[in-house]
Amino acid sequence: MKTPTDQRFDYVKIGLASPERIRQWGERTLPNGQVVGEVTKPETINYRTLKPEMDGLFCEKIFGPSKDWECWCGKYKRVRHRGIVCERCGVEVTESRVRRHRMGFIKLAAPVTHVWYLKGIPSYLSILLDMPLRDVEQIVYFNAYVVLDPGNAGNLSYKQLLSEDQWLEIEEEIYAEDSELVGIEVGIGAEAIQRLLQEINLEEEAERLRTEIVESKGQKRAKLIKRLRVIDNFIATGSQAEWMVLSVIPVIPPDLRPMVQLDGGRFATSDLNDLYRRVINRNNRLSRLQEILAPEIIVRNEKRMLQEAVDALIDNGRRGRTVVGANNRALKSLSDIIEGKQGRFRQNLLGKRVDYSGRSVIVVGPKLKIYQCGLPREMAIELFQPFVIHRLIKLGIVNNIKAAKKMIQRGDANVWHVLDEVITGHPVMLNRAPTLHRLGIQAFEPILVEGRAIQLHPLVCPAFNADFDGDQMAVHIPLSLEAQSEARLLMLACHNILSPATGRPIVAPSQDMVLGCYYLTAENPKAQKGGGRYFASMDDAIRAFDQGLVDLHASVWLRLPVGEKVKTNKPDEEVLETETLPDGSIWKYYRERKTREKDGEIISQYVRTTVGRIIYNKTILEALVV
């Protein structure tokens, strides 16, 4: 049967849920017509039988059976009883995996505010009520009264805050024999906030604000725009303002807050169970106090404690004292589970592990081409294993997959030859987190290398914002031919020379490369070894350096072809000295070069340089010619 979860979806939208919607999440009608879903007891499991308590946080009637196709009392076992509701325990016989998605709810004896909307930045409750956050907090946590209806009292105004003493004085005036005060209403706690929110007509308020914004300026205008934006968002999403005050709390499925038995008979439980237990205990106590008509001060204190328990459940530590468990460790609330790097979204939903991917430390690979990366053999054989197996079978080296896997495990020589064939022309994608722009993922042609580190060309580092101080990168293999061609045509590093954000080159030499270029071309008068020598070609000079006959920075003379023009840093046209040879030719000495001329024609020329500059020039020349 196709369930709604089988359907594909494009995005997840988080919004306010109405009390009716929360009840719908948790309320279910069993095949026998019984309606279940409300969690009324704080118990989890029975300490003797180790079975979930009925109507508790792990109730099988509400959330489904703990064991596949078995009811709580054990009357029905086996799959043939599918869909039957046990007459004794009321548990529906079904799969235990339903406990991963079936929810419950807690009906609160008094409404409470949602701490995200009260203490968030900005505080939507204070913006919507147009009251300072401190005043709203005083009302919610039973420190001050708020005027809901001033009646005919001239000294009272709508939404005015009153202390306990002020309200007692007004009460005495109201109940005096000669009192003319009528219609005065005050409130306290989340009930008062709920009443104020219900009295706001969002459409009318939005129109009034638009009119005021036109006439206002400065700080007041900015405040009005802020409030209008919040109201418009409420209207656009179809949410009611009073939904920010909760009268029903959802209980997440029990398998998402499990209780696990440890060695020695002890139990490890999710922190959420403790937080839910606090809410249920306080809620049940408040219900009993209301039933026996307890004094208002006691009821009010219990309502405040219920508000604090729900705050801790939703976001522990956001307001007031943090609820702690054993060893003074703060309990993880619903917000803690969702938010942050280790939260449900970033860790589990966005950060899923995928097949055909690997991860390793990056090191510099200066001998690579810009479109190449060094892939460790150990990683490559694992990532390309299906391709290698297919190729081994196709070549007739092995007959089946099992034999191919054994051959790979042995490290047979044939495997490495086949791997070389497979990776030729098969690009891989390298990604460095955080992927802040599209150049955070680029394609490269893999080159097999020894060791366990991925080699990266230094020129692509700025695009990845990578350095070699321990950074790690992920490797992904495009599988289909379409993905491979897309990676080759669009994502190959040599096609991503310019930054898509600025249009400027993002591939530019930096750090080690600039230092290396400087070192090669620098002059050092102290480098005397081999200084003043003559070399017929660049290769001769480099060979002499390799043999240790000349220093890298020693000043030497290099013979150049006659037609080649020599450019120097400073003007070098002035002849410093001339020398006439017996054959009639003339040596002309300049600052950085010298030429031999006969009959007005140059027959040979030399330039003063260093071996480092020769190496630099030769490298650049070869790169340009190729």
Swiss-Prot record:
Organism: Microcystis aeruginosa (strain NIES-843 / IAM M-2473)
Pfam families per record: RNA_pol_Rpb1_1 (PF04997), RNA_pol_Rpb1_2 (PF00623), RNA_pol_Rpb1_3 (PF04983)
Keyword terms of this UniProt record: DNA-directed RNA polymerase, Magnesium, Metal-binding, Nucleotidyltransferase, Transcription, Transferase, Zinc
InterPro entries: DNA-dir_RpoC1_gamma, DNA-dir_RpoC_beta_prime, RNA_pol_asu, RNA_pol_N, RNA_pol_Rpb1_1, RNA_pol_Rpb1_3, RNA_pol_Rpb1_3_sf, RNA_pol_Rpb1_clamp_domain
GO cellular component terms given for this protein: DNA-directed RNA polymerase complex
Residues engaged in binding Zn(2+): C71, C73, C86, C89
Protein name per its UniProtKB record: DNA-directed RNA polymerase subunit gamma
Known partners and oligomeric status: In cyanobacteria the RNAP catalytic core is composed of 2 alpha, 1 beta, 1 beta', 1 gamma and 1 omega subunit. When a sigma factor is associated with the core the holoenzyme is formed, which can initiate transcription.
Cell division found in the keyword field: no
Enzyme class, spelled out: transferase
EC numbers, comma separated: 2.7.7.6
Function: DNA-dependent RNA polymerase catalyzes the transcription of DNA into RNA using the four ribonucleoside triphosphates as substrates.
Reported cofactor(s): Mg(2+); Zn(2+)
GO process terms (BP): DNA-templated transcription
Entry-linked Gene3D superfamilies: 1.10.40.90, 2.40.40.20, RNA polymerase II, clamp domain, RNA polymerase Rpb1, domain 3
Superkingdom per UniProt: Bacteria
Catalytic activity line of the entry: RNA(n) + a ribonucleoside 5'-triphosphate = RNA(n+1) + diphosphate
Residues engaged in binding Mg(2+): D467, D469, D471
The UniProt record lists the keyword Magnesium: yes
Family affiliation: Belongs to the RNA polymerase beta' chain family. RpoC1 subfamily.
Alphabetized GO MF terms: DNA binding; DNA-directed RNA polymerase activity; magnesium ion binding; zinc ion binding
Cofactor, how bound (note): Binds 1 Mg(2+) ion per subunit. Binds 1 Zn(2+) ion per subunit.
HAMAP family in the record: RNApol_bact_RpoC1
